[in-house]
Amino acid sequence: MASKSDKQVTVEVNNTGRGRSKSRARSQSRGRGRSVKITVNSQNKGRRQNGRNKRQSNQRVRNIVNKQLRKQGVTGPKPAICQKATATLGTIGSNTSGTTEIEACILLNPVLVEDATGSTQFGPVQALGAQYSMWKLKYLNVRLTSMVGASAVNGTVVRVSLNPTSTPSSTSWSGLGARKHLDVTVGKNAIFKLKPSDLGGPRDGWWLTNTNDNASDTLGPSVEIHTLGRTMSSYQNQQFTGGLFLVELASEWCFTGYAANPNLVNLVKSTDKQVNVTFEGSAGTPLVMNVPAASHFARTVAQRSTLPTSMARAGENTASDTVWQVLNTAVSAAELVTPPPFNWLVKGGWWFVKLIAGRVRNGNRSFYVYASYQDALSNKPALCTGSTSGSMRTRPAVMTTLQFTQMNQPSLGHGETPATLGRSIPTSGETLKVLLTVGNPISPNETNKQTWVNKTIEPPGAVVRIGRDTQHYCTLNGFTLITKVDWFTEEFQPSEEPAPVQGLMVLGDNHKKADVYAAQQYKNPITNDKQEVTSVFLVRVNEGFQVTNHLSYFYRNSVNTDAVENIKIRSATRHTTVRFYQGSWYLLTSTVLHTGPPVSGWLWMNQELQNDQAYIIDQGIMHLITPPPVSSQIYFEMATLVPQTRSGGGETGLELVMGLSDDEYPISHVNDEEETEYETESDEDETDEVDRFDLCCTSDSEDDIENNRVTLLSTLINQGVTVDRATMITNRAFPTPNYKPRREPSNDLLAPSDCLATARSHACNETCQLSGSRGHAE
């Protein structure tokens, strides 16, 4: 660039836009490109230059040239900010097959440079990438730090290579050697160095940051790491399965063009080490990847994928607008059966997918497969030219390891939360809506016949308890096999499967047999002093077990009335065994009759089904008359927190009573015995609330009072007031004939000159006199 220091320096830059052959040199004068000619006088008048002055002169020339190049627009915009950073990306695993295996594919766009741990934290590079529209790299060093000694393992070599297009390809070990690459020996540290000429973008060296734009302008090059040769332990005659290297990127990213896209910092990168993967497709149809809906990969993708913004044609499926890169880092990539002609894509180790909206079959989530990121943005899935053979189609799903990266975020601003296909993560104690798919009837039950239920609490075999411990439990009555469980939030948005309820279990012979995932208890008054309490539990069996019991079934007591409570349990029983299998879901029920005042909160009772008692068809028993049809669905609202019972028979720590419709609540008439015996001082705190509804008038007819009672009770329940509290308020506002003697003396004595204690004492005495004939003691 420079001659001797006492001469002029001339720099000529030709930017013709495309390369031309020497035979077309004359046509360059017609000028489609741009020519920059710079002349610099580097002569320094005065004494002869020493070494320091020569360096200063060279720097002066360099600065002048760079300034002129920037003026001509040859070097692109000036960086607004530069950030040096070292990003830790994860580890390189061992080779388990002996063939070429891909271990990592590193995309260099700053918003995609994250570790694969699933962490939601972001560093300065991601933060700047979300604030500026363009980026470039001054340099890049890929550091491989050995995690094992040089003599600890043998048989494997590692190759780090540069992929300029960030597009999957079918590349052998020799093909990787044709790229710019570095071979690394296991046990030794290494650095793969890349210069700006290797990393320049299409816009005068710059790349776009927003990954929703064209793929060729945004992704930048990628760094791929492969291994060859099975990794063996030098100390043991067996395969080594640990990590070989820690991978870090040391670089300086430059940014320009401020344009804030906050959501770009929220892109997710994670790893699922145990996931079953299958591929399907036929001639002329898109290639589809299937993974279990319960897997970490499927749940994360479903939660983060946004709804499609375009409409599909009739009969077609729509795909989400969110694109995911999938990297298969296990040997099973070669074992995956793929319809032609994209076998090479899957065996290459990485590809792109989009979630198919609403498609869940046999418990699997489905994804369209794309051969490049640009194809994914353009909605051009890989089309199959044929299908897999019959023998291959019947092979079981392959267990593999998937490393996945969220490539884009269609909604880039803060704004409102976008509509997603995802599932929320339930919190402990949250009430969830549960949709249960019914399986085949459990023997001895049969379709279209009465449902057998456990009747006695002292079975010939081991007793099955559902509860907290051997003191607080319910006895198993009804049992229904469930083949599929769908969880939803209270707003009916899809939710993840909650963790098992801590402290709640199914005990068989005093040993834990199953986990309880959700529970519900329904209380329905039958008479003034009797309630039917049905507890419902959704469980999954951890250890298969069986229970031998005396079974019976419910039957209609009379056909001449429409009373819903007119069912009874058959007195004759059947001695048989019911089996529960490991890993299966079951809906278990327990029904008891509670005599006494209504009890708020959860009630633990151990009571067998009684022959001479009438039962009502409540929310739990309604599924125990005949087995529900196979594949039909049952809906419940259930809680995910263990019910805590207070000592002394007080309220429980959790109320699991769900609101019912108006016609499902028989009106409970609380007599003077119950009110007198169970009234507490806490009722005084509700005086203000009761007075709002104190509409009692002696001139009203009994029918009007009863209608007012029904209206008020229904209104309170619909407003979220508990059943017990609503009943107490209703009794005070519109007293029954038994309740009036206690209320009226108190009202008469509540004059301004009398105290509340005197009035209450007088009311109690009057009530005792009225109830003395029944032998009731206050």
UniProtKB/Swiss-Prot annotation:
Any one cellular-component term (Gene Ontology) = T=3 icosahedral viral capsid
Annotated region (P2 globular domain), positions in chain: 424-646
Keywords, A to Z? Answer: Capsid protein, Clathrin-mediated endocytosis of virus by host, T=3 icosahedral capsid protein, Viral penetration into host cytoplasm, Virion, Virus endocytosis by host, Virus entry into host cell
- Example GO biological process: clathrin-dependent endocytosis of virus by host cell
- Extract the PROSITE patterns matched here: EF_HAND_1
Which residues are tagged with the site Cleavage? R313, A314, R393, T394, R423, S424, R646, S647, E655, L656
Acidic, as annotated region: 647-778
Q: Where is this region: Basic?
A: 1-70
- Here the segments flagged for biased composition (Basic residues) are 19-35, 45-57
| Bias (Acidic residues) ranges | 672-689
- On the tree of life, the source organism's domain of life is Viruses
Q: Is the keyword Transmembrane helix assigned to this protein?
A: no
Region Core attachment, as annotated, extends over: 394-423
Ranges for the region named Disordered are 1-59, 670-689
Q: Which InterPro entries match?
A: Astro_capsid_N (IPR004337), Astro_capsid_p (IPR022027), Viral_coat (IPR029053)
Q: Where is this region: Inner core?
A: 71-263
User: What protein family does this chain belong to?
Assistant: Belongs to the astroviridae capsid polyprotein family.
Q: What is this protein called?
A: Capsid polyprotein VP90
